[in-house]
C-alpha cells in the first residue's frame, strides 16, 4: 500500500523518528533529509531502527562527543567497515532471538549509512561481504560525489569534469577524467539482493523503495543522490531543485533491481539536456569555461543517453526473470 505523505506528516509531527534537531550538518545538506525519510518509513512500518554510521559527514556532524543527535541505538565504527559491523549486529540479533532472549513480535531494522567515499571505495569489500553472506541489512548510501568531510577530494563516485582538490580543472586536464562507478550494478551483481536509486525530489518513489528494502528477505541497498551545497557550490535552498535536475537530465536515473529484475521507476516524458544540470553547479564552472567544453559536455550527454537506453533494455530482457 503506497505511503501517504499527509499521513506521515501527521504521524511524525510530534513523534520521535530517531534523529533530532541540533546536528551540525550544513543547511541544505541532503544527508539529514535522507536519514529522516528512511527513519520515518522504518517507524511507520513498525520497525525499531538500529543504526550503523561509517565515518563521514553524517557521523561527525551528528555524534560529536559528548553530544548526539540520535535517539536510537547507533554504532560509529571506522570509515571502511559499517557493512561488516551491521552484519555482526544482525547476526547477534538472530542468535539472541533463537535463544528466546528477544520477543518474537519485536521488529528491528538494521540500517547502515555511508557516504560515497566509504561505499564506492574504502568500504567496498565489507559491503560486498555483507551482500554475499545475505545479511538482512539495509545499506543507505548518501552520494555527494566526493570526500566532502575532508575537503572535497575526488572519489570513485565523482563525475567527469567536477572540480576537486585532488583532480582540479586546469589547462591540461578537465578535472576528473574517469567515469563514475556504477555502484548499483556492482551491488546488483550479488544477485540475491534488492538495489535501487532514489532522489530527494521524488519522495513517493523514495518511500516506496525504503519500504520494499526493509521488507526484503535479504540484503538491500539504496543509493540516494545527496547534494553537497558547500562543495557543489550551490545555494542551500537548491537541494531539491538540483536533485530534480539530476533525474530530468538522465544523470541520476531512478530504477530498482530485485533479484536481477530491472525496473525503471521514473520515465519523464521529456528530458532536459545534461548541460542544464552542469550549469546549475559551481563545481562545473571551470569545466564549462574551457575551450573544449562543448566537446566534453557532448561526450557526457552521449554517455547518459546510452546508459538510459541500456537501462530500458535491461528492464525489458529481465522482466519476469528473477535470479531466484
Curated annotation (Swiss-Prot):
Q: Where is the secretion signal located?
A: none
Q: Which GO terms describe its molecular function?
A: 4 iron, 4 sulfur cluster binding; metal ion binding; pyruvate synthase activity; thiamine pyrophosphate binding
**Cofactor-binding details, from the entry:** Binds 1 [4Fe-4S] cluster per subunit.
Renumbered to this chain, region (Disordered) spans 150-172
Question: Per the record, what are the reactions this protein catalyses?
Answer: 2 oxidized [2Fe-2S]-[ferredoxin] + pyruvate + CoA = 2 reduced [2Fe-2S]-[ferredoxin] + acetyl-CoA + CO2 + H(+)
Read off the InterPro entries from this record.
PorB-like, THDP-binding, TPP_enzyme_TPP-bd
Note the superkingdom of the native organism: Bacteria
The prosthetic group or cofactor this protein requires is:
[4Fe-4S] cluster
Q: Name one Pfam family in it.
A: TPP_enzyme_C
Q: What class of enzyme is it?
A: oxidoreductase
Q: What is this protein called?
A: Pyruvate synthase subunit PorB
Gene symbol?
porB
Amino acid at each position: 500500500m503506497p505511503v501517504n505523505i499527509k499521513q506521515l506528516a501527521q504521524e511524525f509531527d510530534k513523534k520521535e523518528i530517531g534523529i533530532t534537531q541540533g546536528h551540525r550538518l550544513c543547511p541544505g545538506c541532503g544527508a539529514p533529509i535522507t536519514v529522516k525519510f528512511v527513519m520515518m518509513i522504518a517507524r511507520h512500518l513498525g520497525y525499531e531502527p538500529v543504526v550503523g554510521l561509517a565515518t563521514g559527514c553524517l557521523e561527525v556532524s551528528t555524534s560529536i562527543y559528548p553530544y548526539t543527535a540520535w535517539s536510537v541505538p547507533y554504532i560509529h565504527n571506522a570509515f571502511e567497515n559499517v557493512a561488516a559491523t551491521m552484519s555482526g549486529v544482525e547476526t547477534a540479533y538472530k542468535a539472541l532471538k533463537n535463544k528466546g532472549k528477544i520477543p518474537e513480535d519485536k521488529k528491528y531494522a538494521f540500517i547502515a549509512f555511508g557516504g560515497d567515499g566509504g561505499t564506492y571505495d574504502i568500504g567496498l569489500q565489507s559491503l560486498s561481504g555483507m551482500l554475499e553472506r545475505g545479511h538482512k541489512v539495509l545499506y543507505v548510501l548518501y552520494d555527494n560525489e566526493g570526500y566532502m568531510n575532508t575537503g572535497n577530494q575526488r572519489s570513485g563516485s565523482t563525475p567527469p569534469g567536477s572540480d576537486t582538490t585532488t583532480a582540479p580543472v586546469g589547462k591540461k586536464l578537465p578535472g576528473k577524467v574517469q567515469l563514475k562507478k556504477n555502484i548499483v550494478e556492482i551491488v546488483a551483481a550479488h544477485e540475491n539482493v534488492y538495489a535501487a536509486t532514489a532522489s530527494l525530489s521524488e519522495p513517493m518513489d523514495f518511500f516506496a523503495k525504503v519500504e520494499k528494502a526493509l521488507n526484503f528477505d535479504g540484503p538491500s541497498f539504496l543509493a540516494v543522490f545527496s547534494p553537497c551545497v558547500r562543495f557543489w557550490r550551490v545555494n542551500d535552498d537548491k537541494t531539491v531543485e538540483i536533485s530534480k535536475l539530476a533525474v530530468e537530465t538522465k544523470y541520476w536515473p531512478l530504477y530498482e533491481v530485485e533479484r536481477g529484475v530491472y525496473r525503471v521507476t521514473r520515465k519523464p516524458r521529456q528530458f532536459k539536456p545534461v548541460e542544464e544540470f552542469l550549469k546549475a553547479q559551481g563545481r562545473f564552472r571551470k569545466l564549462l569555461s574551457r575551450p573544449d567544453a562543448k566537446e566534453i559536455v557532448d561526450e557526457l550527454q552521449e554517455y547518459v543517453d546510452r546508459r538510459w537506453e541500456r537501462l530500458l533494455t535491461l528492464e525489458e530482457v529481465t522482466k519476469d526473470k528473477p535470479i531466484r
